[in-house]
A protein has these predicted regions:
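Pocket-lining segment of extracytoplasmic ligand-binding domains
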Residues: 128-133, 138-180
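Ligand-binding cleft/hinge of the Venus flytrap
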Residues: 5-17, 57, 103-123, 138, ...
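Short loop->beta-strand "edge-of-pocket" segments that line small-molecule binding or catalytic clefts
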Residues: 87-100, 140
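Short beta-strand and adjacent tight-turn residues that come in two discontinuous sequence segments
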Residues: 24, 43-44, 64-66, 96, ...
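Short coil/turn segments
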Residues: 1, 69, 78-82, 97-102, ...
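Pocket-flanking alpha-helical
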Residues: 2-7, 22-62, 71-86, 103-107, ...
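Short helix-loop capping/hinge motifs at secondary-structure junctions, enriched
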Residues: 13, 79-88, 115-117
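Short beta-strand-to-loop elements that line the ligand-binding cleft
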Residues: 18-26, 43, 117-127, 165-166
C-alpha cells in the first residue's frame, strides 16, 4: 500500500522517478527477475534472497531496505475444517503456491513444530486460486501472508470467526521478512 500511495500522491514523480508496479508471482519469481535485470527493484522475502545468492554466487542482486522485521508468513486455515494450530495440519490438505515465500519456509516451520510432513497432503495451487480454494473447501489451509490471505478470505465471504491464522513467527520461525 505505501508504494501505491506514493504513486497516487505524486511523491515518486516529485523526486524525478517514474515508477510502475507490476503484479508479482512471489519472492522466488521476483528475485531472479531483479538479478537478470528484467526489473530494477523487487519486493521479496530476504530469506529467499539469501537462498538464491547461496545457489547463485555473485548474482547482481542485493537487499537495500528491510520492510518487514517480522515475516507475515502464515498458514491460514478454516476452523470449520479443523485447522487452528500447527499439529492440525497432519491429516489436512494444504494449498501452497510453489513460488510462495511462506511455502519456501514450510520445511523449517514443520521441523520447528515436530510435524510429520508425510501426513500433510500438499496441493500445489496458483496465487489467484489459493484463497478461493480454501473458501470453497477444496483445501483445509493455505500458505501465504497473514494479512493478504485473511483479507482475501473475508472478501470471499468467509466469516472472520472461521479464519485461523498460524503466524510462523509465533511458532518457532524467527526470521526477517521482506526487503526491497
Amino acid at each position: 500500500a505505501p508504494y501505491f500511495l506514493a504513486i497516487d500522491k505524486g511523491f515518486f514523480k516529485s523526486e524525478g522517478l517514474e515508477v510502475e508496479i507490476t503484479p508479482g508471482k512471489g519472492s522466488l519469481a521476483a528475485i531472479p527477475k531483479v538479478a537478470t535485470g528484467a526489473f530494477p527493484f523487487g519486493f521479496a522475502d530476504i530469506n529467499s534472497l539469501i537462498k538464491f545468492l547461496d545457489q547463485n554466487p555473485g548474482a547482481p542482486v542485493i537487499a537495500i531496505m528491510m520492510v518487514y522485521d517480522k515475516p507475515p508468513f502464515a498458514i491460514v486455515g478454516r476452523k470449520s475444517r479443523g485447522v487452528e494450530k500447527p499439529k492440525d495440519l497432519e491429516g489436512a490438505v494444504l494449498g501452497a503456491p510453489p513460488p510462495d515465500g511462506a511455502w519456501a519456509q514450510f520445511p523449517s516451520f514443520a521441523k520447528a513444530n515436530n510435524l510429520d510432513v508425510k501426513k500433510v497432503k500438499v496441493e500445489p495451487v496458483g496465487f489467484p486460486t489459493r484463497e478461493p480454494m480454501l473458501a470453497e473447501g477444496k483445501v483445509d489451509a493455505v500458505t501465504g501472508y497473514s494479512f493478504s490471505s485473511y483479507l482475501n478470505l473475508a472478501r470471499l465471504g468467509v466469516p472472520e470467526s472461521d479464519i485461523s491464522t498460524i503466524l510462523m513467527a509465533d511458532y518457532g520461525l524467527k526470521l526477517y521478512g521482506n526487503a526491497i
